[in-house]
């Protein structure tokens, strides 16, 4: 009996992986304590591609802003955690870290929320 030949598997090209992350800054922007355009500029200056900040890899990473939402799109591997790190760095720089926190509301997005301050109300009730 003749040996069976396995059919040749053609190696197709991998699909280009496009990563899209969203940062929702609606609450602080509406309250006027944060400027979305300033935050967008901060991200453009700080995001590193191939170890270099500020160049965004010649178009492989793009940042778009629509009102108070910032969208970061990347053709190369890009960490959502890195986006959170940069957001926290921006908040610290602008002295907003004490009032705002970065929360993941979906798998592809973060949201800036205020800290819930319920402890002060409970302490006041206990003193009565």
UniProtKB/Swiss-Prot annotation:
One of its GO terms (biological process) is cytoplasmic translation. It is found in: Cytoplasm. GO terms for molecular function: RNA binding; structural constituent of ribosome. Coiled coil: none annotated. Keywords: Cytoplasm, Ribonucleoprotein, Ribosomal protein. It comes from the Eukaryota. Pfam families: Ribosomal_L22e. One of its GO terms (cellular component) is cytoplasm. Belongs to the eukaryotic ribosomal protein eL22 family. Component of the large ribosomal subunit. The ribosome is a large ribonucleoprotein complex responsible for the synthesis of proteins in the cell. Component of the large ribosomal subunit. This is Large ribosomal subunit protein eL22. It comes from Ictalurus punctatus (Channel catfish). The gene is rpl22.
């Amino acid at each position: 009996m003749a040996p069976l030949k396995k059919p040749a598997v053609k190696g197709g090209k991998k699909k280009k992986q496009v990563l899209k992350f969203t940062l929702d800054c609606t609450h602080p922007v509406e309250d006027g304590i944060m400027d979305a355009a300033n935050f967008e500029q901060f991200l453009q200056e700080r995001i590193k591609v191939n170890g270099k900040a500020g160049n965004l890899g010649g178009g492989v990473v793009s940042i778009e802003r629509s009102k108070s939402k910032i969208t970061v799109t990347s053709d190369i591997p890009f960490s959502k955690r890195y986006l959170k790190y940069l957001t926290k760095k921006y908040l610290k720089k602008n002295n907003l870290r004490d009032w705002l926190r970065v929360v993941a509301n979906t798998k592809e997005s973060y949201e800036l929320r205020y800290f819930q301050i319920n402890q002060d109300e409970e302490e006041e009730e206990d003193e009565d």
